[in-house]
Amino acid sequence: MKPYPIKFVSIVIPVYNERQSLPELLRRTEAACEQLDHRFEIVLVDDGSRDDSTDILQRAAERADSPFVAVILNRNYGQHAAIMAGFEQCQGDVVITLDADLQNPPEEIPRLVKLAEQGYDVVGTVRSNRQDSAWRRWPSKLINLAVQRSTGVAMNDYGCMLRAYRRTIVDAMLACRERSTFIPILANSFARHTTEVLVDHAEREHGDSKYSPMRLINLMFDLITCMTTTPLRLLSIIGFSMALLGVLFAALLIVLRLIFGASWAGDGMFVLFAVLFVFTGGQFIGMGLLGEYLGRMYSDVRARPRFFIEKIVRSSSPVATDSIDSSVTPYMNKVAP
């Protein structure tokens, strides 16, 4: 592993209804970046916020000699789509992603940059003393285990978005045009050298988590379908096993009927109904998984954009865009020679 020279650092932060957190987020993130011996930009992607977040981001970007870049999406597309929009607009040799809720400290940015300079393609983080509820922690552990087995990359916390990516990894992810993606997994599929570090995890001080139960379910399906096609293979195995169990159980029912007569279980009606419901449920599970894959393939075949950037604001210069492929030379904040 060879050292990786870094001249310019980009920070990408997706924002959705974080009006109360933004002033502290902007202050702490800029202060952390000023500790770097590199030029930097802080790309803030507004993911269709309905509060005052958009106005706050634009004012920050319009400030004279501002290191902030405001990327305004026309509606809410989700956290990972917003990060990809930030990836398209940033130009750093290393790109760091960070959540806007301040549960992960921006002060860790210099440490991640130093690790990236050592030659790591991806620098992940593990939340120590995680301050989420148990119903969020346990599913996360199961997902991390499933991802490790599917990708072969042993990382312990795929849910923590405080991460550093080498430019080549970011470019590789941008070349992937699928609509449903999970960035940490996608990055690790291209990375050769990865590492993880422990970071603090604070309680959310303002607002609530933007991951509702339905969003978590959608995220789970994104994880399943972007990692592997193994569930499709499992369908045939499960179907064969269920059919075999059905035959054996039917034979058992016949034997019991011959021995004890038809009255032993209500003429067998309730047992047959139970068996019918079990196997029907299994079929619907399989059909649902198959439908998820087909639906996502349909979305990819249509080749619609994953997001639409309404406006880009950088250093008092709002730039309207007509497509997601608009390119603007990034503002380079000269905080160090």
From Swiss-Prot:
Keywords: Antibiotic resistance, Cell inner membrane, Cell membrane, Glycosyltransferase, Lipid A biosynthesis, Lipid biosynthesis, Lipid metabolism, Lipopolysaccharide biosynthesis, Membrane, Transferase, Transmembrane, Transmembrane helix. Its EC number is 2.4.2.53. GO terms for biological process: 4-amino-4-deoxy-alpha-L-arabinopyranosyl undecaprenyl phosphate biosynthetic process; lipid A biosynthetic process; lipopolysaccharide biosynthetic process; response to antibiotic. One of its GO terms (cellular component) is plasma membrane. It is found in: Cell inner membrane. Its main location: membrane. Pfam families: Glycos_transf_2. One of its GO terms (molecular function) is undecaprenyl-phosphate 4-deoxy-4-formamido-L-arabinose transferase activity. The chain crosses the membrane at residues 235-255, 270-290. Coiled coil: none annotated. Pathway: Glycolipid biosynthesis; 4-amino-4-deoxy-alpha-L-arabinose undecaprenyl phosphate biosynthesis; 4-amino-4-deoxy-alpha-L-arabinose undecaprenyl phosphate from UDP-4-deoxy-4-formamido-beta-L-arabinose and undecaprenyl phosphate: step 1/2; Bacterial outer membrane biogenesis; lipopolysaccharide biosynthesis. Disulfide bonds: none annotated. It is an enzyme of class 2 (transferase). It is a multi-pass membrane protein. It comes from the Bacteria. It catalyses: UDP-4-deoxy-4-formamido-beta-L-arabinose + di-trans,octa-cis-undecaprenyl phosphate = 4-deoxy-4-formamido-alpha-L-arabinopyranosyl di-trans,octa-cis-undecaprenyl phosphate + UDP. Belongs to the glycosyltransferase 2 family. Catalyzes the transfer of 4-deoxy-4-formamido-L-arabinose from UDP to undecaprenyl phosphate. The modified arabinose is attached to lipid A and is required for resistance to polymyxin and cationic antimicrobial peptides. This is Undecaprenyl-phosphate 4-deoxy-4-formamido-L-arabinose transferase. The lineage of its organism: Bacteria, Pseudomonadati, Pseudomonadota, Gammaproteobacteria, Pseudomonadales. The gene is arnC.
